[in-house]
Amino acid sequence: MSQTSTLKGQCIAEFLGTGLLIFFGVGCVAALKVAGASFGQWEISVIWGLGVAMAIYLTAGVSGAHLNPAVTIALWLFACFDKRKVIPFIVSQVAGAFCAAALVYGLYYNLFFDFEQTHHIVRGSVESVDLAGTFSTYPNPHINFVQAFAVEMVITAILMGLILALTDDGNGVPRGPLAPLLIGLLIAVIGASMGPLTGFAMNPARDFGPKVFAWLAGWGNVAFTGGRDIPYFLVPLFGPIVGAIVGAFAYRKLIGRHLPCDICVVEEKETTTPSEQKASL
């Protein structure tokens, strides 16, 4: 298979995997907000976590199941991921999230309309932000912009560090097929503990793609600003990227360097030609 066709298949996998996790997660929130479903924070967090686990099972063998631009960037910087694939992966992830949000909206369309009519909500007003939160994340009204950024950075750093730990066969017993479920459980635990603060985005694609859809679907600028002076979309867009870089750096320097093998070093040795190895002596 050519490199081009391989990249195409990987991008399709990232599109479908990211779309799948958004379909389950946003669908759960839509059921809560407009269909009268009774979910607590833990139940919502578990559904998001299981959605991620299912998406990983679907795509891991094709693309590695990044499903998150922050993860893709961190793996490029700290785990030898091919830099030429970074932009295509990110575009695929955002597109998958956008399309899944649109699909959920289409399936729940009548319920959204009836909910707005019943509660006299004008789409695009500040009062409609809570309903826009069906698709993407907005902060608790009691925390400010900087605090929200710090929350997203910290929880994504924890997520990234533990993803590397859970998928590193050199770090204890190999997890194999259990790794996706453990990652899903990790997301559920983070969501249950920190979700009430920012909605635990931890994923620029998960947040930005659906925000773009909400903007197009009538929520307008409030979808990006969240009704705040500083556009809130910047927090779940850049906070997770910074956090993932910090988490990957911390794992590599504090844990990974003390393990028996170094993945990047091994890969570099395997790709070095005999003449290059001789020249390096």
UniProtKB/Swiss-Prot annotation:
Q: Where are the transmembrane segments?
A: 6-34, 40-60, 85-108, 144-169, 178-194, 232-254
Short sequence motif NPA 2: positions: 203-205
What regulation of activity is recorded for this protein? Transport of glycerol is blocked by mercuric ions (Hg(2+)) but not N-ethylmaleimide.
So what does mutating M160I actually do? In strain: HB101
**GO BP term, example:** cellular response to mercury ion
- Where, by residue number, is the motif NPA 1? 68-70
Sites where the protein binds glycerol 1 = H66, L67, N68, N203
Induction details: Expression is regulated by the HTH-type transcriptional regulator GlpR and by the cAMP-cAMP receptor protein (CRP) complex.
Q: Which PROSITE patterns does the entry mention?
A: MIP
Q: Which reaction does it catalyse?
A: glycerol(in) = glycerol(out)
Q: Which UniProt keywords apply?
A: Cell inner membrane, Cell membrane, Membrane, Repeat, Transmembrane, Transmembrane helix, Transport
Intramembrane segments as residue ranges: 64-67, 68-78, 199-202, 203-216
Per UniProt, where does glycerol 3 bind? G199, F200, A201, R206
CC terms in the record's Gene Ontology section: plasma membrane
Q: Which regions face the Periplasmic side of the membrane?
A: 35-39, 109-143, 195-198, 217-231
The residues on the Cytoplasmic side of the membrane are: 1-5, 61-63, 79-84, 170-177, 255-281
* Domain of life where this protein originates: Bacteria
InterPro entries (alphabetical): Aquaporin-like (IPR023271), MIP (IPR000425), MIP/Aquaporin (IPR050363), MIP_CS (IPR022357)
Q: Which family does it belong to?
A: Belongs to the MIP/aquaporin (TC 1.A.8) family.
The miscellaneous annotation reads: The remarkable property of effective water conductance combined with a strict exclusion of all ions including protons is mediated by two conserved asparagines which force a central water molecule to serve strictly as a hydrogen bond donor to its neighboring water molecules. Assisted by the electrostatic potential generated by two half-membrane spanning loops, this dictates opposite orientations of water molecules in the two halves of the channel, and thus prevents the formation of a 'proton wire', while permitting rapid water diffusion.
Task: Fill in the domain comment.
Answer: Aquaporins contain two tandem repeats each containing three membrane-spanning domains and a pore-forming loop with the signature motif Asn-Pro-Ala (NPA).
- Any idea what this protein is called? Glycerol uptake facilitator protein
Gene name, Swiss-Prot/TrEMBL: glpF
